[in-house]
Amino acid sequence: MERRVRVKSWVEENRASFQPPVCNKLMHQEQLKIMFVGGPNTRKDYHIEEGEEVFYQLEGDMILRVLEQGQHRDVPIRQGEIFLLPARVPHSPQRFANTMGLVIERRRLESELDGLRYYVGDTEDVLFEKWFHCKDLGTQLAPIIQEFFHSEQYRTGKPNPDQLLKELPFPLNTRSIMKPMSLKAWLDGHSRELQAGTSLSLFGDSYETQVIAHGQGSSKGPRQDVDVWLWQQEGSSKVTMGGQCIALAPDDSLLVPAGTSYVWERAQGSVALSVTQDPARKKPWW
Protein backbone atom coordinates (compact mmCIF):
# COMPACT_ATOMS: atom_id res chain seq x y z
CA MET A 1 0.00 0.00 0.00
CA GLU A 2 1.34 3.40 -0.98
CA ARG A 3 1.16 6.04 1.73
CA ARG A 4 1.26 9.79 1.68
CA VAL A 5 4.12 11.51 3.47
CA ARG A 6 3.82 15.03 4.85
CA VAL A 7 7.23 16.46 4.01
CA LYS A 8 7.88 18.81 6.93
CA SER A 9 6.53 16.29 9.46
CA TRP A 10 8.79 13.58 7.99
CA VAL A 11 11.79 15.91 8.24
CA GLU A 12 11.01 16.63 11.92
CA GLU A 13 10.57 12.94 12.72
CA ASN A 14 13.95 12.18 11.17
CA ARG A 15 15.79 15.30 12.37
CA ALA A 16 18.47 13.25 14.14
CA SER A 17 19.48 11.64 10.83
CA PHE A 18 20.56 14.98 9.39
CA GLN A 19 23.38 15.62 11.85
CA PRO A 20 27.05 15.09 10.87
CA PRO A 21 28.64 12.91 9.77
CA VAL A 22 25.70 11.36 7.85
CA CYS A 23 23.61 14.51 7.21
CA ASN A 24 21.12 12.83 4.85
CA LYS A 25 18.24 10.37 4.73
CA LEU A 26 16.22 8.90 1.88
CA MET A 27 12.45 9.27 1.92
CA HIS A 28 12.17 7.01 -1.16
CA GLN A 29 14.75 4.77 -2.80
CA GLU A 30 13.08 3.36 -5.88
CA GLN A 31 13.53 4.52 -9.49
CA LEU A 32 13.42 8.01 -8.00
CA LYS A 33 15.70 8.82 -5.08
CA ILE A 34 13.96 11.39 -2.87
CA MET A 35 16.41 12.50 -0.18
CA PHE A 36 16.79 15.27 2.35
CA VAL A 37 20.17 16.66 3.36
CA GLY A 38 21.18 18.71 6.40
CA GLY A 39 24.49 20.20 7.47
CA PRO A 40 27.11 21.32 8.10
CA ASN A 41 28.93 19.48 5.36
CA THR A 42 31.82 21.24 3.61
CA ARG A 43 33.33 19.20 0.78
CA LYS A 44 36.28 19.40 -1.57
CA ASP A 45 35.21 16.53 -3.84
CA TYR A 46 33.16 16.98 -7.01
CA HIS A 47 30.51 14.47 -8.05
CA ILE A 48 29.74 13.81 -11.73
CA GLU A 49 26.83 11.73 -13.02
CA GLU A 50 25.02 11.06 -16.28
CA GLY A 51 21.64 12.04 -14.85
CA GLU A 52 20.28 15.34 -13.55
CA GLU A 53 19.59 16.49 -9.99
CA VAL A 54 16.82 18.67 -8.57
CA PHE A 55 17.67 20.84 -5.56
CA TYR A 56 15.16 22.63 -3.33
CA GLN A 57 15.99 24.39 -0.07
CA LEU A 58 13.39 23.95 2.65
CA GLU A 59 15.39 25.63 5.43
CA GLY A 60 18.30 28.04 5.08
CA ASP A 61 20.68 28.48 2.15
CA MET A 62 23.33 26.30 0.52
CA ILE A 63 26.11 26.72 -2.02
CA LEU A 64 26.47 24.37 -4.98
CA ARG A 65 30.02 24.67 -6.27
CA VAL A 66 30.19 23.71 -9.96
CA LEU A 67 32.72 23.49 -12.76
CA GLU A 68 30.93 25.34 -15.54
CA GLN A 69 32.54 25.74 -18.95
CA GLY A 70 36.00 25.35 -17.42
CA GLN A 71 35.43 27.76 -14.51
CA HIS A 72 34.78 26.99 -10.86
CA ARG A 73 31.89 29.03 -9.50
CA ASP A 74 29.43 29.04 -6.63
CA VAL A 75 25.69 28.77 -7.21
CA PRO A 76 23.81 30.01 -4.11
CA ILE A 77 20.48 28.20 -3.60
CA ARG A 78 18.46 30.13 -1.05
CA GLN A 79 15.59 29.02 1.14
CA GLY A 80 12.52 28.39 -1.01
CA GLU A 81 14.49 28.22 -4.26
CA ILE A 82 14.46 25.32 -6.73
CA PHE A 83 17.27 24.46 -9.14
CA LEU A 84 17.91 21.85 -11.83
CA LEU A 85 21.51 20.73 -12.27
CA PRO A 86 22.15 19.41 -15.80
CA ALA A 87 23.77 16.03 -16.34
CA ARG A 88 27.56 15.66 -16.53
CA VAL A 89 28.38 18.82 -14.53
CA PRO A 90 31.00 18.42 -11.76
CA HIS A 91 29.39 19.69 -8.55
CA SER A 92 30.25 19.93 -4.88
CA PRO A 93 27.43 20.74 -2.40
CA GLN A 94 28.39 23.03 0.48
CA ARG A 95 25.86 22.89 3.31
CA PHE A 96 25.69 24.74 6.59
CA ALA A 97 24.34 24.14 10.09
CA ASN A 98 20.57 24.41 10.60
CA THR A 99 19.75 24.00 6.92
CA MET A 100 17.65 21.41 5.11
CA GLY A 101 17.52 20.64 1.41
CA LEU A 102 15.62 18.28 -0.87
CA VAL A 103 17.60 16.47 -3.59
CA ILE A 104 15.99 14.31 -6.28
CA GLU A 105 17.93 12.02 -8.58
CA ARG A 106 17.21 8.70 -10.29
CA ARG A 107 18.41 5.12 -10.30
CA ARG A 108 21.38 4.71 -12.63
CA LEU A 109 21.17 2.61 -15.77
CA GLU A 110 23.49 -0.39 -15.82
CA SER A 111 25.55 1.31 -18.52
CA GLU A 112 26.07 4.54 -16.55
CA LEU A 113 29.05 5.58 -14.45
CA ASP A 114 29.48 8.18 -11.73
CA GLY A 115 32.73 9.98 -11.03
CA LEU A 116 34.27 11.49 -7.91
CA ARG A 117 37.01 14.01 -8.53
CA TYR A 118 39.36 16.31 -6.68
CA TYR A 119 40.91 19.19 -8.59
CA VAL A 120 44.21 21.01 -8.16
CA GLY A 121 43.04 24.24 -6.51
CA ASP A 122 40.71 26.23 -8.76
CA THR A 123 42.05 24.72 -11.97
CA GLU A 124 40.60 22.08 -14.29
CA ASP A 125 43.58 19.82 -13.54
CA VAL A 126 42.43 16.59 -11.93
CA LEU A 127 44.29 15.64 -8.75
CA PHE A 128 42.46 12.36 -8.03
CA GLU A 129 39.45 10.55 -9.48
CA LYS A 130 37.45 7.34 -9.23
CA TRP A 131 34.72 6.12 -11.59
CA PHE A 132 32.12 3.59 -10.47
CA HIS A 133 28.63 2.27 -11.11
CA CYS A 134 26.49 3.91 -8.45
CA LYS A 135 23.99 1.78 -6.57
CA ASP A 136 24.08 3.54 -3.19
CA LEU A 137 25.87 6.87 -3.20
CA GLY A 138 25.66 7.12 0.59
CA THR A 139 27.79 4.02 1.13
CA GLN A 140 29.98 4.19 -1.97
CA LEU A 141 31.36 7.72 -1.55
CA ALA A 142 32.89 7.37 1.92
CA PRO A 143 35.51 4.70 1.01
CA ILE A 144 36.61 6.73 -2.04
CA ILE A 145 36.96 9.88 0.05
CA GLN A 146 39.00 7.97 2.64
CA GLU A 147 41.18 6.53 -0.12
CA PHE A 148 41.92 10.06 -1.30
CA PHE A 149 42.84 11.27 2.19
CA HIS A 150 45.35 8.41 2.49
CA SER A 151 46.77 8.91 -1.00
CA GLU A 152 50.06 10.30 -2.24
CA GLN A 153 48.07 12.84 -4.24
CA TYR A 154 46.53 14.25 -1.07
CA ARG A 155 49.90 14.35 0.69
CA THR A 156 51.77 16.05 -2.15
CA GLY A 157 49.01 17.97 -3.95
CA LYS A 158 50.26 16.50 -7.23
CA PRO A 159 48.35 14.12 -9.54
CA ASN A 160 49.59 10.71 -10.59
CA PRO A 161 49.00 10.59 -14.38
CA ASP A 162 49.03 6.78 -14.32
CA GLN A 163 45.91 6.79 -12.11
CA LEU A 164 43.89 9.20 -14.26
CA LEU A 165 41.70 8.11 -17.16
CA LYS A 166 43.12 8.89 -20.57
CA GLU A 167 39.57 9.25 -21.90
CA LEU A 168 36.45 10.02 -19.87
CA PRO A 169 33.38 7.74 -20.01
CA PHE A 170 31.46 10.79 -21.30
CA PRO A 171 32.26 14.44 -22.06
CA LEU A 172 31.54 17.07 -19.43
CA ASN A 173 28.52 19.25 -20.10
CA THR A 174 29.22 22.60 -21.77
CA ARG A 175 25.75 24.16 -21.51
CA SER A 176 25.21 27.21 -19.31
CA ILE A 177 23.66 26.56 -15.92
CA MET A 178 20.34 28.22 -15.12
CA LYS A 179 19.78 30.38 -12.06
CA PRO A 180 17.87 29.00 -9.06
CA MET A 181 14.38 30.47 -8.74
CA SER A 182 11.84 30.97 -5.98
CA LEU A 183 9.30 28.17 -6.26
CA LYS A 184 6.52 30.14 -4.58
CA ALA A 185 7.11 33.23 -6.72
CA TRP A 186 7.03 31.09 -9.88
CA LEU A 187 3.79 29.38 -8.84
CA ASP A 188 2.19 32.69 -7.83
CA GLY A 189 3.21 34.23 -11.15
CA HIS A 190 1.48 31.43 -13.08
CA SER A 191 -1.57 31.00 -10.84
CA ARG A 192 -4.06 32.20 -13.45
CA GLU A 193 -2.88 29.63 -16.01
CA LEU A 194 -2.75 26.85 -13.44
CA GLN A 195 -6.28 27.49 -12.20
CA ALA A 196 -7.47 27.57 -15.81
CA GLY A 197 -6.37 23.95 -16.03
CA THR A 198 -3.04 24.40 -17.83
CA SER A 199 -0.14 22.30 -16.51
CA LEU A 200 3.24 24.03 -16.84
CA SER A 201 6.83 22.79 -16.86
CA LEU A 202 9.21 24.67 -14.56
CA PHE A 203 12.30 23.84 -16.60
CA GLY A 204 11.01 23.30 -20.13
CA ASP A 205 11.21 20.21 -22.29
CA SER A 206 14.94 19.93 -23.01
CA TYR A 207 15.76 17.88 -19.89
CA GLU A 208 15.07 14.31 -18.82
CA THR A 209 13.71 15.79 -15.58
CA GLN A 210 10.15 17.04 -15.73
CA VAL A 211 8.92 19.17 -12.82
CA ILE A 212 5.34 20.00 -13.75
CA ALA A 213 3.07 22.41 -11.88
CA HIS A 214 -0.63 21.48 -11.93
CA GLY A 215 -3.71 23.48 -11.00
CA GLN A 216 -7.27 22.19 -10.84
CA GLY A 217 -8.08 19.35 -13.22
CA SER A 218 -7.22 15.69 -13.55
CA SER A 219 -4.53 13.47 -15.02
CA LYS A 220 -3.81 9.78 -15.10
CA GLY A 221 -1.04 7.25 -15.65
CA PRO A 222 0.82 4.93 -15.62
CA ARG A 223 4.32 5.94 -16.58
CA GLN A 224 5.67 2.51 -17.46
CA ASP A 225 9.35 2.87 -16.60
CA VAL A 226 9.58 5.79 -14.18
CA ASP A 227 8.23 6.76 -10.77
CA VAL A 228 6.09 9.87 -10.35
CA TRP A 229 6.50 11.91 -7.17
CA LEU A 230 3.58 14.17 -6.29
CA TRP A 231 3.89 17.08 -3.85
CA GLN A 232 0.82 19.12 -2.93
CA GLN A 233 1.62 22.82 -2.50
CA GLU A 234 -1.81 24.43 -1.99
CA GLY A 235 -5.40 23.23 -1.77
CA SER A 236 -6.30 19.57 -2.06
CA SER A 237 -6.32 16.64 -4.45
CA LYS A 238 -6.94 12.92 -4.40
CA VAL A 239 -5.13 10.03 -6.04
CA THR A 240 -6.92 6.78 -6.84
CA MET A 241 -4.70 3.75 -7.43
CA GLY A 242 -4.61 0.10 -6.48
CA GLY A 243 -8.17 0.24 -5.17
CA GLN A 244 -7.46 3.00 -2.66
CA CYS A 245 -8.16 6.71 -2.64
CA ILE A 246 -5.45 8.88 -1.09
CA ALA A 247 -6.29 12.46 -0.15
CA LEU A 248 -3.49 15.03 -0.37
CA ALA A 249 -3.45 18.24 1.69
CA PRO A 250 -0.78 20.99 1.54
CA ASP A 251 2.75 19.58 1.98
CA ASP A 252 1.57 15.97 1.49
CA SER A 253 3.59 13.92 -0.98
CA LEU A 254 3.06 10.57 -2.66
CA LEU A 255 5.30 8.31 -4.74
CA VAL A 256 3.48 6.56 -7.59
CA PRO A 257 5.67 3.56 -8.51
CA ALA A 258 6.61 2.92 -12.13
CA GLY A 259 3.91 1.07 -14.04
CA THR A 260 1.14 1.87 -11.55
CA SER A 261 -2.23 2.97 -12.94
CA TYR A 262 -3.56 6.04 -11.17
CA VAL A 263 -6.02 8.90 -11.51
CA TRP A 264 -5.14 12.25 -9.91
CA GLU A 265 -8.03 14.66 -9.37
CA ARG A 266 -7.21 18.20 -8.23
CA ALA A 267 -9.84 20.45 -6.67
CA GLN A 268 -10.37 24.15 -7.36
CA GLY A 269 -7.54 26.10 -5.73
CA SER A 270 -5.19 23.12 -5.89
CA VAL A 271 -1.54 23.69 -6.78
CA ALA A 272 0.73 20.65 -6.90
CA LEU A 273 3.96 19.41 -8.44
CA SER A 274 4.74 16.16 -10.22
CA VAL A 275 8.36 15.10 -10.69
CA THR A 276 9.73 12.47 -13.09
CA GLN A 277 13.21 11.66 -14.32
CA ASP A 278 13.13 9.56 -17.46
CA PRO A 279 16.52 8.39 -18.81
CA ALA A 280 14.82 7.70 -22.15
CA ARG A 281 14.78 11.51 -22.53
CA LYS A 282 18.58 11.77 -22.25
CA LYS A 283 20.12 13.91 -24.95
CA PRO A 284 22.96 12.36 -26.99
CA TRP A 285 26.32 13.86 -25.99
CA TRP A 286 28.32 12.77 -29.00
Swiss-Prot record:
The catalytic activity of this protein is classed by the Enzyme Commission as: 1.13.11.6
Q: Which reaction does it catalyse?
A: 3-hydroxyanthranilate + O2 = (2Z,4Z)-2-amino-3-carboxymuconate 6-semialdehyde
Q: Which CDD domains match?
A: cupin_HAO
- Residue ranges annotated as transmembrane are none
Keywords assigned: Cytoplasm, Dioxygenase, Iron, Metal-binding, Oxidoreductase, Pyridine nucleotide biosynthesis
Listed Gene3D superfamilies: Jelly Rolls (2.60.120.10)
What InterPro entries does the record tag this protein with? 3hydroanth_dOase, 3hydroanth_dOase_met, RmlC-like_jellyroll, RmlC_Cupin_sf
**Region named Domain A (catalytic):** 1-160
Positions contributing to substrate binding: E53, R95, E105
Name the enzyme's class.
Answer: oxidoreductase
> Molecular function (GO) terms listed?
3-hydroxyanthranilate 3,4-dioxygenase activity; ferrous iron binding
This protein's source sits in the domain of life called Eukaryota
Q: Which GO terms describe its biological process?
A: 'de novo' NAD biosynthetic process from L-tryptophan; anthranilate metabolic process; dicarboxylic acid metabolic process; L-tryptophan catabolic process; NAD biosynthetic process; neuron cellular homeostasis; quinolinate biosynthetic process; response to cadmium ion
Q: Which residues bind Fe cation?
A: H47, E53, H91
> What residue spans carry the region label Linker?
161-177
| Record note on disruption phenotype | No visible phenotype. Mice were born at the expected Mendelian ratio and are normal. They however show very high levels of 3-hydroxyanthranilate compared to wild-type mice.
Cite the residue spans of the region called Domain B: 178-286
**Gene Ontology CC terms:** cytosol
* Entry's localization field: Cytoplasm, Cytosol
- Associated pathway: Cofactor biosynthesis; NAD(+) biosynthesis; quinolinate from L-kynurenine: step 3/3
The answer, when asked if Cytoplasm is one of the entry's keywords, is yes
* Residues at which O2 binds: R43
Assembly and binders: Monomer.
The record's annotation in NCBIfam families points to:
anthran_nbaC
Family recorded in the similarity comment = Belongs to the 3-HAO family.
This one is known as 3-hydroxyanthranilate 3,4-dioxygenase
To which species is this protein native? Mus musculus
